[in-house]
Amino acid sequence: KARSPRETSLALLLCLPYNLGGFNLGTVELNRPIELENRYGEKITRIPDLTIQLKDKRQKRATVLLDYDPAVTHSGGQKITRDLDRENELVTGVQCPHFSVSGEMLKSFESVQGLVRQIRESTGITARDTTMSDLEERQRALWARLFKTR
């Protein structure tokens, strides 16, 4: 159900297990419809690019939504306004963190690491322990395969 290769790549990087170079955030659904009410009280459907279900070793669970930043992906004032309205509806209609990610952010491994930190901090779900000494190297290698510009 991915709408773009970038969505698939981001889902892989964030949710694959550590041994495959991912950040092991949890399970992911691409473009899962979410029913909510808009600011006028109307029932609407919004579709974030990624819906990630995180859980820790004590089975605490949290949900995070991710979208590409509309100001970066769409041009034109009306489209940007519509995209921002959609984002605001998600933030107020669903009781979970919502993050916007731009293509520019994905060009920096450190930026992706920062996004993962923000996701974990916003949910209170800590990273699972690992004994892998080369974890960052594996993550950097996967990121480079998926996002590094040639």
Language-model segment annotations:
Residues 1-150:
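Surface segments flanking catalytic/ligand-binding clefts of nucleic-acid enzymes
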